[in-house]
Amino acid sequence: MHFGKLFIENSESEIHIPSFIVGMVSPETIEEDDFEDLHTFDEDGNMDVREFYEQFDFKNLNLKEKSFVLGYYCHLWFDEYYKFNASKLTVNNNADLTDEELSLAVKSTLRNYDSKYINNFFEKYFKEIAGFKEDINIKELGGICIKKARDKIADFLSEDVPESVYPQLIDEHEYMSLMKNGCSKIMRSL
């Protein structure tokens, strides 16, 4: 959601935010086999997100459809970006946490950083998201479940911000720079 907010704030195109948000969560609603059928992967399992983006004629999509596709693309693009760039973050495990403890501490800390940046940005769109129609008319995105996407968004918005935060693990500025660099790269890809 953090990356989605960055995208919205930096986009030069008009975006229907509720459609974008539902689109951004929608890849998580597709069954794994269907997901692989809808997208192109290389032999190493890396997705060709550019090919996904280029299959759409944005001139023939209305604002809501275009925003939905951009949200979906944003999710795919960020997954690939994070996969290749998260290792650039410096993790300082000075407390000698176990792997399991470290994983939970990193997730909690990044979730806290994300929450500070997002700062209730999406809550004002919740009613419109809750009423988002089931019939998104984009044949290239078969297999998505709008109801599941709405439920995932509701769950995200109702989550508590983690109180156990370990800022010494990952520098907040370094993490924010990773996110901003990703956003500038996706903007150049459009």
Model-predicted regions and their roles:
Residues 1-190:
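N-terminal leader/auxiliary helical segments
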